[in-house]
């Protein structure tokens, strides 16, 4: 089998602030969890690599949100697969569904790093344990390109706390996206939905580090860059593309839909 499938239910902690829907960041975390479970079936989980003085890192995520996101308690299905392996790089593609319809899809770039040198390890063992499925959800593994900023939109500072860190003792991926999300004004998020997120992780940061996140407008409407820096050096770059929410994207319409299904 060259695809791994896992189902989840949308829980309270993963809902957005307004419409009882799954937060986009939570969709990414479900995908990351599914990948971790997939690697465990091949004895390549984080704890397996720890014994060989290595660890997984994700370098990039690129994800499209193509339909309204599922509501609280609904079941979602994630399919994830290894789509490409080079000498040092590992690409995964993934698709998220609910009610048998795709609501998000994308890809991620991974490396296995040596703990001592912090350099990528060769991927020979992966080609032995994983089957390759060359199905590309976004058509290609697009290189991350940071658009030119035209003006600063918002800017905040954040000091990493205990809840930002993971078992590797560095700041986790979710926290960087949360920091960027905090720069998006409340009124904007009420009226717009996230259409695409492309993120590049550049450096690790740790407990107690102070980060600055600057969100910028670009030449394209509804496209923004989010630059997260430590001491003036970028640790994470994010590009987001947004669109106006549809009329169906509210809890009243959802309740009517559920009522009609029961009749």
Predicted regions and their residues:
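Hot-dog-fold acyl-thioester-processing enzymes
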Residues: 1-58, 107, 114-193, 247-263
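HotDog/MaoC-like acyl-thioester-processing domains
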Residues: 2-7, 62-146, 201, 205-207, ...
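Acidic/His-leaning functional-site neighborhoods
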Residues: 152, 158-241, 245
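Exposed loop/turn and edge beta-strand positions of beta-sandwich/beta-sheet ligand-binding modules
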Residues: 59, 90, 195
């Amino acid at each position: 089998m060259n695809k791994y499938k896992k189902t989840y239910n949308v829980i309270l902690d993963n809902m957005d602030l307004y419409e009882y829907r799954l937060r986009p960041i939570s969709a990414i975390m479900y995908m990351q969890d599914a990948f971790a479970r997939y690697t465990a079936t091949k004895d390549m989980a984080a704890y397996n690599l720890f014994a060989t003085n290595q660890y997984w890192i994700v370098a990039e995520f690129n994800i499209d949100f193509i339909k309204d996101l599922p509501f609280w308690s609904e079941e979602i299905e994630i399919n994830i697969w290894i789509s490409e392996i080079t000498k040092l790089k590992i690409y995964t593609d993934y698709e998220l569904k609910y009610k048998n319809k795709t609501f998000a899809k994308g890809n991620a770039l991974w490396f296995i790093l040596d703990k001592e040198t912090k350099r990528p390890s060769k991927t020979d063992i992966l080609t032995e344990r994983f089957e390759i499925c060359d199905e590309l959800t976004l058509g290609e593994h697009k290189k991350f390109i940071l658009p030119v900023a035209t003006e600063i939109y918002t800017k905040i500072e954040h000091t990493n706390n205990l809840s930002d860190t993971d078992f590797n003792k560095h700041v986790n991926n979710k926290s960087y996206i949360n920091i960027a999300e905090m720069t998006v004004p409340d009124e904007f998020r009420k009226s717009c939905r996230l259409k695409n997120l492309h993120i590049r992780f550049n450096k690790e940061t740790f407990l107690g580090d102070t980060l600055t996140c600057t969100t910028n407008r670009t030449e394209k409407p509804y496209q923004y860059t989010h630059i997260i820096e430590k001491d003036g050096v970028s640790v994470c770059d994010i590009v987001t593309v947004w669109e106006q929410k549809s009329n169906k994207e509210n809890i009243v319409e959802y309740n009517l839909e559920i009522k009609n299904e029961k009749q």
